[in-house]
Amino acid sequence: MTNIRKTHPLMKIVNSSFIDLPAPSNISSWWNFGSLLGICLIAQILTGLFLAMHYTSDTMTAFSSVTHICRDVNYGWLIRYLHANGASMFFICLFLHVGRGLYYGSYMFLETWNIGVLLLFAVMATAFMGYVLPWGQMSFWGATVITNLLSAIPYIGTNLVEWIWGGFSVDKATLTRFFAFHFILPFIVAALAGVHLLFLHETGSNNPSGLNSDADKIPFHPYYTIKDILGALIMITALSSLVLFSPDMLGDPDNYIPANPLNTPPHIKPEWYFLFAYAILRSIPNKLGGVLALVLSILILMVIPLLHTAKQRSMTFRPMSQCMFWILVADLFTLTWIGGQPVEHPFVVIGQLASMIYFLMIILIMPITSMIENKLLKW
């Protein structure tokens, strides 16, 4: 009898994606993050669903409803903190996943890479809108500052901002629509992730050597299923430790103060995973310039395949490029640190330098380094 998993229309899809999928025999733990992101997304949708059962998207009751979830709902505190810190876990996995793609030249799969960048934008939008929902001080002022950036768009800016707000300031209409969008976006992300996977399976996975691995493939199950389970257990352990021991470590204390339009917090800053982009935004004194730099800091990922000048795909055998890559990583850490600092000397100058290095590194220095390596190898 033919195996049902190979004949049933639905099982066939699962089989070809997670069971009989031919995978390179040498992919390292850096290839675990795709499955970890899938787990994060499922966890976020489930915890979010249970939070939505108790949350009210009204300016008068939003803050109280979150307090009610934490105090009165059975394990509400656990669901809330799993959701909040799950977002941090999501972004840690995202950044590592993108970093892996940059290091090993996975961006040469154009469709997969571009949909990945689109996914990054969608997840960032989802996280931003989710941060507004508890309606604390940082929620309100974060929403005000970030939506206000759109007013930098010439001619239509002001109208666009008021259209997004649903009034003349961030208010009830804004909160209600942000809740609606925050609810729907993760499902769009899930659909996009399906397309991301579809395009990846057209080409097969890349591997650490960057060479063609058609001659040496192994089935995904049991080899990589068991490897993914180990990765998942490590991530779940890390998330559980964070949630159960220091759930507020990554949050802002200001968000425990109910939103007050008449009182601005001394330092408005986003969650840690947006700080690098926030630092780039602040490093340009012009409003429109800052907004453009902010968008380009992520959009630049789309041009990376065009800037690939090396004769080898991966950085595994390219020590100079490796050096440049790790300088870029250090620069991103610097930007993240600067984003959380007040706007004063010397942080402003450090931020401007780090922003300049970020763009120069990607557009100029790394492609030139690759060309030098080609020369050294007489290619």
UniProtKB/Swiss-Prot annotation:
Transmembrane spans: 33-53, 77-98, 113-133, 178-198, 226-246, 288-308, 320-340, 347-367
GO cellular component: mitochondrial inner membrane; respiratory chain complex III
CDD domains: cytochrome_b_C, Cytochrome_b_N
UniProt keyword terms in alphabetical order: Electron transport, Heme, Iron, Membrane, Metal-binding, Mitochondrion, Mitochondrion inner membrane, Respiratory chain, Transmembrane, Transmembrane helix, Transport, Ubiquinone
Membrane topology: Multi-pass membrane protein
Binding residue positions for a ubiquinone: 201
Subcellular location, principal: mitochondrion
Superkingdom as given in the UniProt entry: Eukaryota
Pfam family, one: Cytochrome_B
GO annotation terms (biological process): mitochondrial electron transport, ubiquinol to cytochrome c
Cofactor(s) demanded: heme b
Amino acids binding heme b b562: 83, 182
Subunit field text: The cytochrome bc1 complex contains 11 subunits: 3 respiratory subunits (MT-CYB, CYC1 and UQCRFS1), 2 core proteins (UQCRC1 and UQCRC2) and 6 low-molecular weight proteins (UQCRH/QCR6, UQCRB/QCR7, UQCRQ/QCR8, UQCR10/QCR9, UQCR11/QCR10 and a cleavage product of UQCRFS1). This cytochrome bc1 complex then forms a dimer.
Function: Component of the ubiquinol-cytochrome c reductase complex (complex III or cytochrome b-c1 complex) that is part of the mitochondrial respiratory chain. The b-c1 complex mediates electron transfer from ubiquinol to cytochrome c. Contributes to the generation of a proton gradient across the mitochondrial membrane that is then used for ATP synthesis.
The protein's name: Cytochrome b
Organism: Suncus stoliczkanus
Gene designation: MT-CYB
